[in-house]
Amino acid sequence: MKIVVDENMPYAEALFGRLGEVVAVRGRPLPAAALVGADALMVRSVTTVNQALLAGQRVRFVGTATAGTDHVDTAWLAQAGIGFSAAPGCNAIAVVEYVFSALMLLAERDGFALRDKTVGIVGVGNVGSRLQRRLTALGIRTLLCDPPRADRGDDEQFHSLADLQREADIITFHTPLNKSGPYRTLHLADADFLRGLPPGRILINAGRGAVVDNAALLQALEAGQDLRVVLDVWEPEPMLSLPLLARVDIATPHIAGYSLEGKARGTTQVFEAFSTFLGQPQSVVLPSLLPPPPVASVRIHGHPDQAMLKRLMHLVYDVRRDDVPLRRVAAQEGEFDRLRKHYPARREWSSLQVLCDDCTSASLLTALGFDARVA
C-alpha cells in the first residue's frame, strides 16, 4: 500500500509506515507524479484536494492533519467514494495560547489589565470554547458570537456580531471560512464592521484569512483608525499584503496552531482514522512521541499576577519569535511558506511544570493549562 504524506507532518513516516509504504512530498504544490499508484493521501491546509487533483487516481482515503477543511472538496470525495478524515480540535490549544501570548504582549506594551477588558469571541467551536474557559479562569468577561450554535439552541448565552462590535474591547475570530449560505463568514469583518468599531479596539484573526476583509482593514488603518491588529492569517496566502503587514501590531505566517503537540495530534488523529478505515484500528499515546521540553520546570512564589503570567506564558511561547522573522523576509518570494515549513519546535503550556507555594495559585495555573502543583 502506498501512502503519500506531507513532508511537514511530524511523526507521519513512523506512524503510517506501520500500514504501508510512505512517500513524503511537499504540500504546495503537491507533485502530481507522487499520486500515481497511491492508495491514500495525507495533507495539511496548504494542499487543495479536489477532483482536479485526484480524478483518475486510485486514492481511496484522504486525511488532513488540520481542524479546518475548506481546502478539501469533501462533497466530491463523498461522491467519488473516497474516505475522509480531518483532525478537529488538534491545534485548538495552540491557537488559544497564541491569542494569550499576543494579548499579554499588547497589555504590557499599552499598559492595560486584561481583567478590565471584555473579550468577544466569534466562533465558539474547539478553539473559541477553550479560549472562553481560560479567559473565564482569569476573571475576564467574554461575549460569545456563534449564529449556528445559537440557532440550534445550544446552552450558552450568545450575542450578535453587532453586540460585540459595541461592547467588546477585544474581538477575536475563530470561525471556518464559509463563502456562501446562511452562515457566510467570508468578509465577516468588512468595511462597515471595521468602521463601526470604537477607538482603541483590538482585532485578532487566527482562523481563516478571508474572514477579515484585508483590503478594507488596510484602508481603515491607512486612514488612521485607532485599532490594534493581530493577524496570523491573511488574504490571500502566501502572497500577503506588505502594506498591511507594515501596519498591524503583530503579524505571523499562519502558525497560531503550530505547536509540536498540535501537529502531533493532527497526525495521530488521521492515522487512527485511516487505520480504522482499513479495519486495523490502532491508537497512539501522544506523550510517547514528544521530546522533552526545553524548559521542564520552574518555581514561582506568591499568587501569579498578570506580569508573572506573561513571563510564564512567554517562557513557553513568545509570539515575537514569529513576528520578527516574517517582517524581515515577507517581501521575498516563497519565504512565507519557508517559515512554515522550517518552523522551530514550539511547545504548549502543559509541557511546563510550575511549582507553586499554595493551592490557589496551582489551581489557577492548572485551569490555564500549565502542569502546576504545590511543592
Swiss-Prot record:
Signal peptide: none annotated. PANTHER family: FORMATE DEHYDROGENASE 1. It comes from Edwardsiella ictaluri (strain 93-146). The active site is at 208, 237, 254 (proton donor). The gene is pdxB. Catalyzes the oxidation of erythronate-4-phosphate to 3-hydroxy-2-oxo-4-phosphonooxybutanoate. It catalyses: 4-phospho-D-erythronate + NAD(+) = (R)-3-hydroxy-2-oxo-4-phosphooxybutanoate + NADH + H(+). InterPro entries: D-isomer_2_OHA_DH_cat_dom, D-isomer_DH_CS, D-isomer_DH_CS1, D-isomer_DH_NAD-bd, Erythronate-4-P_DHase, Erythronate-4-P_DHase_dimer, NAD(P)-bd_dom_sf, PdxB_dimer_sf. Its EC number is 1.1.1.290. Keywords: Cytoplasm, NAD, Oxidoreductase, Pyridoxine biosynthesis. One of its GO terms (molecular function) is NAD binding. Substrate binds at residues 45, 66, 258. CDD domains: ErythrP_dh. One of its GO terms (biological process) is pyridoxine biosynthetic process. This is Erythronate-4-phosphate dehydrogenase. It comes from the Bacteria. SUPFAM superfamilies: Formate/glycerate dehydrogenase catalytic domain-like (SSF52283), NAD(P)-binding Rossmann-fold domains (SSF51735). NAD(+) binds at residues 146, 175, 232, 257. The keyword Oxidoreductase applies.
